[in-house]
Amino acid sequence: TPMSLLSSAGESGAGSGVKNIVFFDNVRVPAKNLIGGENNGWQVATTHLELEHGTGGRIARNWIVDRIFDHCKETRFDGQPISSERFTQDKLIDIYIDAEIGRLFQLRNYWMRHTGASFTYEGPQASYFRKTSGLRIATNILEILGPHALTNDEEIAVEEGHIEAHQRAAIIALHPGGTTDIQ
């Protein structure tokens, strides 16, 4: 069954464009092909969900945050960097706080995963925060840059169109499958 999905033309993981879903009814899997053993399917499924929903963790910084900070320092308006405006500074602070809180959640989860610690709420917490803070970050970037954040036009695009792609991706990342609140 083809599904035409909203695309940011560069989603990681799922890819972009048309998706196909295949349904099987009354299928029996031979015991030798079971993943995780008999009656252990739920454990296999939840392990996948744990990894998908943030328990893998990560240590990388948010590259879009670094780019927007550099852009605001380097771009001048009336002879001054736009980062010197109080409004822009307030928005940049909000962006930085959201990015670093999310990074701390991911660092914690990375540490837990690699030390063999047990997870309870940590993965869904990081996933939910990543999704909601991503939209807040995109909104703050839009408020700083205005319409320049929404175009990939060569003459006026910010960061070679990466900001425009980030704006589209932030909406999709809020709920790439299901709803934001279901973790």
Regions found by a protein language model. Give the residues of each.
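Hydrophobic packing residues in well-ordered alpha-helices of helical domains and bundles
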Residues: 61, 85, 92, 123-126, ...
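C-terminal helix-coil-helix/basic helical segment that borders enzyme active sites and/or dimer interfaces
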Residues: 73, 77-86, 100-157
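Glycine-rich phosphate/cofactor-binding loops in nucleotide/flavin-utilizing enzymes
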Residues: 39-58, 145-183
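Tryptophan-centric aromatic hotspots in well-structured domains and transmembrane helices
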Residues: 22-23, 42-44, 71, 97, ...
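FAD-binding core of flavoproteins
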Residues: 1-77
